[in-house]
């Protein structure tokens, strides 16, 4: 039996520790990572992939994939507790630690202000940004269908981040502070990491690596020097 009251209390405590302004050790970041989490074997295994890209070229220089036994069932609002063990395992495998991590998921744009990007950022003490594909909480004004349509994401009078249409006629991204990155900087860094797709390159690569997509398989054959 999962004690959700205890988890809520932990979320609120950790959320109070999140740094919501820029606190970079390396400016500009020399290496930017993307992190993506998924599940295998009907949820029994949690898989995390982290892709390390050199900035500003956005070339992939390292990737790591970790698989761990899933220790918590799916409970809405508590997904970070289910995902972070695999993220930590992948993080420990990295040879080159990044200066900034874009996480496929929410940062402070969470009912208790602790999505996986914030939770993971606190655990490894690295600047993180949440780049989510769906809204978890908050409201925003309707967006134009054009590329770069933008609106603040707000909840209870607080701006949690940005809703940004990165590509015309595609669903928008929900961008928020994870840890040690301000809201405006979070948006700016995601925009700097775009290369014509809906997703920024770091999380696009992490997703491709985690899913072993054909495009990644072809790329890997051409770049055997990239380390795992």
From Swiss-Prot:
Positions of the record's site feature: Interaction with target DNA:
74
Q: What is its EC number?
A: 3.1.21.7
Its localization reads: Cytoplasm
| Cofactor(s) needed for function | Mg(2+)
Reaction(s) the record says it catalyses: Endonucleolytic cleavage at apurinic or apyrimidinic sites to products with a 5'-phosphate
Question: Coiled-coil stretches, from where to where?
Answer: none
User: Mainly localized where?
Assistant: cytoplasm
- Protein's GO biological process: DNA repair
Q: Where does Mg(2+) bind?
A: 36, 104
| InterPro entries to which the protein is assigned, alphabetical | Endonuclease-V
Keyword Magnesium annotated: yes
Task: Return the GO cellular component terms, semicolon-separated.
Answer: cytoplasm
The molecular function GO annotations come to:
deoxyribonuclease V activity; magnesium ion binding; RNA endonuclease activity, producing 5'-phosphomonoesters; single-stranded RNA binding
Q: Which UniProt keywords apply?
A: Cytoplasm, DNA damage, DNA repair, Endonuclease, Hydrolase, Magnesium, Metal-binding, Nuclease
Please give the HAMAP family that the UniProt record associates with this protein: Endonuclease_5 (MF_00801)
The UniProt function text for this chain reads:
DNA repair enzyme involved in the repair of deaminated bases. Selectively cleaves double-stranded DNA at the second phosphodiester bond 3' to a deoxyinosine leaving behind the intact lesion on the nicked DNA.
State the NCBIfam families in the record: PRK11617.1
Q: What family is it from? A: Belongs to the endonuclease V family.
- What is the name of this protein? Endonuclease V
């Amino acid at each position: 039996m999962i004690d959700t009251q205890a988890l809520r209390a932990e979320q609120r405590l950790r959320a109070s520790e999140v740094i919501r302004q820029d606190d970079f050790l390396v400016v500009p970041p020399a290496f930017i990572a993307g992190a993506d989490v998924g599940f295998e074997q009907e949820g029994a295994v949690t898989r995390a992939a982290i892709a390390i890209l050199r900035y500003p070229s956005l070339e992939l220089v390292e990737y790591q994939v970790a698989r761990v036994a899933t220790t918590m069932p799916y409970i809405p609002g508590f997904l970070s507790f289910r995902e972070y063990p695999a993220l930590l395992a992948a993080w420990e495998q990295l040879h080159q630690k990044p200066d900034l991590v874009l996480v496929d998921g929410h940062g402070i744009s969470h009912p208790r202000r602790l999505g996986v990007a914030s939770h993971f950022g606190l655990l490894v003490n690295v600047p993180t940004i949440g780049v989510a594909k769906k809204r978890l909480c908050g409201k925003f004004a309707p967006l134009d269908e054009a590329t770069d349509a933008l609106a603040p994401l707000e909840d209870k009078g607080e701006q949690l981040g940005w809703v940004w249409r990165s590509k015309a006629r595609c669903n928008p991204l929900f961008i928020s502070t994870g840890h040690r990155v301000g809201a405006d900087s979070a948006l700016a860094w995601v925009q700097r990491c775009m290369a014509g797709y809906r997703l920024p390159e770091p999380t696009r690569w992490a997703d491709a690596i985690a899913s072993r997509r054909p495009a990644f398989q072809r790329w890997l054959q051409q770049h055997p020097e990239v380390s795992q």
